[in-house]
Regions:
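Active-site pre-lysine segment of PLP-dependent enzymes
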Residues: 1-21
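Short acidic, glycine/serine/threonine-rich loops at helix termini
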Residues: 1-7, 34-37, 151
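Active-site PLP attachment segment
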Residues: 14-47
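Short hydrophobic/aromatic beta-strand micro-patches
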Residues: 38, 115-117, 156-158
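Short, ordered loop/turn segments at secondary-structure junctions
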Residues: 42, 62, 143-145
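A short glycine-threonine-serine/GTX helix/turn-capping micro-motif
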Residues: 52-61, 79
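Conserved PLP-dependent catalytic core of the aminotransferase class-I/II
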Residues: 63-110, 114-137
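PLP-dependent enzyme catalytic core of the Aspartate aminotransferase-like
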Residues: 133-134, 145-201
Length: 201
């Protein structure tokens, strides 16, 4: 989904023909399952065929999944695909900018997946519980997928999102952050009060 021709960062850097092994997923741009491995020579292909655990324990794509991938690839290579990538990157940059303006910590480089740092697992879970109340939806990622104490949301941006959609989710996240943080402080205070009460007996 990245770059003018949709060939990703490796295509943008002009390295596609120089890479010995290229691996890609069908779960994002292609909205399917599985992925691919492309190699330069038959020796690498044979090695991966026999010694790559992901290949050994996988199955072939179904015909329906393969047809979906091919249909998506046709769009990627078309003028429609180019226009959608431009809209997508515009939305990515707009979301990152609006999140930052709202005082939220955005991680990583611009891509269709926008991570927003929450901090502790406790706060992350409370904010995740609050977010749908305010009209937002995001994937919570926490330890062990990320370092302990560094939980985050992963927002997935689409070309079809409008700036109004993005404004709404930024507003929802800011409200959920306030509510979740207040709830975490309240739980912490209650715990301290209970501890003091037990100590007094």
């Amino acid at each position: 989904s990245m770059g003018a021709d949709g060939k990703g960062n490796i295509g943008r850097s002009g390295m596609l023909d120089q890479a010995d092994i290229v691996i890609g997923s069908f779960s994002k741009t292609f909205a399917s399952n599985g992925g691919f491995v492309s190699v330069k020579d038959t020796y690498a292909a044979e090695y991966l065929r026999y010694y790559s655990a992901p290949h050994t324990f996988t199955n072939a794509l179904s015909p329906v999944q393969a047809a979906g991938v091919l249909a998506a690839l046709e769009i990627v290579r078309s003028e429609e695909g180019r226009a959608r990538r431009e809209r997508l990157m515009d939305n990515v940059l707009y979301l990152r900018n609006e999140m930052t303006k709202a005082g939220l910590e955005v991680l990583g480089e611009p891509s269709p997946i926008v991570p927003v740092r929450l901090g502790s697992e406790a706060v992350g879970r409370l904010v995740a519980r609050q977010l749908p109340r305010f009209g937002g939806l995001a994937n919570l990622v926490e330890y062990p997928a990320v370092p302990r104490g560094d939980s985050r949301f992963r927002f997935q941006v689409m070309a079809d999102h409008t700036h109004e959609d993005i404004d709404a989710v930024v507003k929802a996240l800011a409200a959920a952050m306030r509510a979740g943080t207040q709830e975490a402080l309240s739980i912490e205070r209650d715990g301290d009060n209970n501890a003091h009460g037990r100590a007094g007996h």
